[in-house]
Amino acid sequence: MKAFKQKQVWFITGSQDLYGPKVLEQVAKNSEQIVHGFNESSAISIEVVYKPTVKSPREIHAVCQAANSDENCVGVILWMHTFSPAKMWIAGLNELSKPFMHLHTQFNAELPWSEINMNYMNTHQSAHGCREFGFIGTRMRKERKVVVGHWQSSDVQAQIDDWCRAAAGWHESQNLRIARFGDNMRQVAVTEGDKVAAQIQFGYEVHAYSLGELNEAIAAIAEGDVTAQLDRYASEYQVGNELFGDEYQLDRLRKEAKIELGLTQFLTQGGFGAFTNCFENLTGMTGLPGLATQRLMANGFGYGGEGDWKTAAMVRIMKVMGQGRAGGTSFMEDYTYNFGATDQVLGAHMLEVCPSIAAAKPRLEVHRHTIGVRCDVPRLLFTGKAGPAINVSTIDLGNRFRIILNELDTVTPPQDLPNLPVASALWEPRPNLAVAAAAWIHAGGAHHSAYSQAITTDQIVDFAEMAGAELVIIDADTKIREFKNELRQNSVYYGLARGL
């Protein structure tokens, strides 16, 4: 079973009528076998759909139009089995609005040395057919992924899957709706941004709603549904006897369950995939949602605190991209440092860290929330599982959006955190905290990020290229002088590219 149900990537092979019916039959047969191999492979998480070989400008244009209008198609893989004169592709590529990958492969891995003849050479021409196609992509300035190697190679299939996941994320971005309850935290700069520009570039819509509308949805939840929700909490988390045995704590938990159910209903009925709220805008609420927000994220919704709609969007997009993979994705904040032999960052937030990143079964507890509405709020407590991760931040620079990515190594805390009443993750940024933090600050990265152990750097690279967005990467090879020069060069490139 593929991780992405209903979503598809189309496999389109290019050729021409020059070769005659026998060669074209072989081209079609080989293409079908490749598609079958991809669909049988556990390495590729999305269904690949075979499309008949295209041999003329009219056929190419028609299949590109069909891909555009098919809601289930998130992108296309293009392969030139033989030589397919690239002028035939101009109208189709001009029409194509879905992302495309150029797969530079051939059907047979090895040459049949003792049998090879000109019939074989004319049938298996990817080596120069794909170069012809590559030229027209470059000439038309088309952004695309190029994957090179034999189609059965595990490395090639991993690259294909990375791109397919990015294409699924881009498809989600094009259809995503984000609900904002309240506004940004007052006087905060980085969570602001141009929502119209974001919709033009990324596709997602951001809509504001009053707390009154949300409170109506919460008030409409039946008490029987609240009781059933408490039963779910008891079965899914570590819950101390004192919580259900204490009348006051139980009341706070019932209120939180009601918030979760009301929020879920509001978002689902409105077709929203992500939401934001702010601790400064809680009129009529019993508190800042804690457990409710954590569970909504665990169920796939994106979230951004303090009105941070850009991070909410990225959390949702990355959750879609990571479907079926180990690890999780969460809203996150760089909170405090541990300077020592190896400098570390303790990431957390006031309440809202997703349990999909938890190292062990979370504990459900009620603690005092001291910012905004000061009250006792149920929340899940845990530490993040150890392993490689990334932090991704999207910022608005005025004339463009920039995505900043830092590769991390999440580690197990050396000691317990018995007095910390929020979920957290401890990580060591690559190459180290001194370089990573300086680079992040030079790039303008936010204090919020989308943290993930399910998504790879390559997938974010593919996504950023689909979006036409600037991406800067902080990893083990980062050096500050080179990084600052990259930022300067990017400023020139993206400034000129808008007018070219």
UniProtKB/Swiss-Prot annotation:
<feature type="binding site">
    <location>
        <position position="306"/>
    </location>
    <ligand>
        <name>Mn(2+)</name>
    </ligand>
</feature>
<dbReference type="GO" id="GO:0005829">
    <property type="term" value="C:cytosol"/>
</dbReference>
<comment type="pathway">
    <text>Carbohydrate degradation; L-arabinose degradation via L-ribulose; D-xylulose 5-phosphate from L-arabinose (bacterial route): step 1/3.</text>
</comment>
<dbReference type="InterPro" id="IPR038583">
    <property type="entry name" value="AraA_N_sf"/>
</dbReference>
<keyword id="KW-0464">Manganese</keyword>
<dbReference type="InterPro" id="IPR055389">
    <property type="entry name" value="AraA_N"/>
</dbReference>
<keyword id="KW-0479">Metal-binding</keyword>
<dbReference type="Pfam" id="PF02610">
    <property type="entry name" value="AraA_N"/>
</dbReference>
<dbReference type="InterPro" id="IPR009015">
    <property type="entry name" value="Fucose_isomerase_N/cen_sf"/>
</dbReference>
<dbReference type="GO" id="GO:0030145">
    <property type="term" value="F:manganese ion binding"/>
</dbReference>
<feature type="binding site">
    <location>
        <position position="349"/>
    </location>
    <ligand>
        <name>Mn(2+)</name>
    </ligand>
</feature>
<comment type="function">
    <text>Catalyzes the conversion of L-arabinose to L-ribulose.</text>
</comment>
<dbReference type="InterPro" id="IPR004216">
    <property type="entry name" value="Fuc/Ara_isomerase_C"/>
</dbReference>
<dbReference type="InterPro" id="IPR024664">
    <property type="entry name" value="Ara_Isoase_C"/>
</dbReference>
<comment type="similarity">
    <text>Belongs to the arabinose isomerase family.</text>
</comment>
<dbReference type="GO" id="GO:0008733">
    <property type="term" value="F:L-arabinose isomerase activity"/>
</dbReference>
<keyword id="KW-0119">Carbohydrate metabolism</keyword>
<dbReference type="InterPro" id="IPR003762">
    <property type="entry name" value="Lara_isomerase"/>
</dbReference>
<keyword id="KW-0413">Isomerase</keyword>
<dbReference type="Pfam" id="PF24856">
    <property type="entry name" value="AraA_central"/>
</dbReference>
<feature type="binding site">
    <location>
        <position position="448"/>
    </location>
    <ligand>
        <name>Mn(2+)</name>
    </ligand>
</feature>
<feature type="binding site">
    <location>
        <position position="333"/>
    </location>
    <ligand>
        <name>Mn(2+)</name>
    </ligand>
</feature>
<dbReference type="InterPro" id="IPR055390">
    <property type="entry name" value="AraA_central"/>
</dbReference>
<dbReference type="Pfam" id="PF11762">
    <property type="entry name" value="Arabinose_Iso_C"/>
</dbReference>
<keyword id="KW-0054">Arabinose catabolism</keyword>
<dbReference type="GO" id="GO:0019569">
    <property type="term" value="P:L-arabinose catabolic process to xylulose 5-phosphate"/>
</dbReference>
<protein>
    <recommendedName>
        <fullName>L-arabinose isomerase</fullName>
        <ecNumber>5.3.1.4</ecNumber>
    </recommendedName>
</protein>
